[in-house]
Amino acid sequence: MPTINQLVRKPRKSKIEKSDSPALNIGYNSHKKVHTKIAAPQKRGVATRVGTMTPKKPNSALRKFARVRLSNLIEVTAYIPGIGHNLQEHSVVLIRGGRVKDLPGVRYHIVRGALDTAGVADRKQGRSKYGAKRPKG
């Protein structure tokens, strides 16, 4: 426990909060070619690679992912949620924050039903999370 005198000489430092999705907190000024500090809830990007990845131990699957070059020129790995997708190289996608616990290095999710990404077909429940329209009838 520090004394009052020690605290007067050297005050306590406040804890620095680290972002879970740092690429969303950076903007880009293409006119000046400089990165700016502008936070955004989502960002647009272009898929540079689409593939599958295997999760960490105890799980076993082929998880779909896309490598995305964002509008701020940062390249990130994003998870493609839902069953089946229509993404390929050069597809324009919208990403949001949110990691995938069993895929190391995947800190972002692709938003289904936005831009070039189609919603999940034949989805009856939890449709809003997968960009699925309300079924007729």
Curated annotation (Swiss-Prot):
Keywords: Methylation, Ribonucleoprotein, Ribosomal protein, RNA-binding, rRNA-binding, tRNA-binding
Taxonomic source organism: Streptococcus uberis (strain ATCC BAA-854 / 0140J)
Gene name as annotated: rpsL
Protein's recorded name: Small ribosomal subunit protein uS12
Chain spans, region Disordered: 1-21, 34-57
Transmembrane residue ranges: none
PTM-bearing positions, type 3-methylthioaspartic acid: D102
The keyword RNA-binding appears for this protein: yes
Matching Gene3D superfamilies: Nucleic acid-binding proteins (2.40.50.140)
Functional description taken from the UniProt entry: With S4 and S5 plays an important role in translational accuracy. Interacts with and stabilizes bases of the 16S rRNA that are involved in tRNA selection in the A site and with the mRNA backbone. Located at the interface of the 30S and 50S subunits, it traverses the body of the 30S subunit contacting proteins on the other side and probably holding the rRNA structure together. The combined cluster of proteins S8, S12 and S17 appears to hold together the shoulder and platform of the 30S subunit.
One term under GO cellular component: small ribosomal subunit
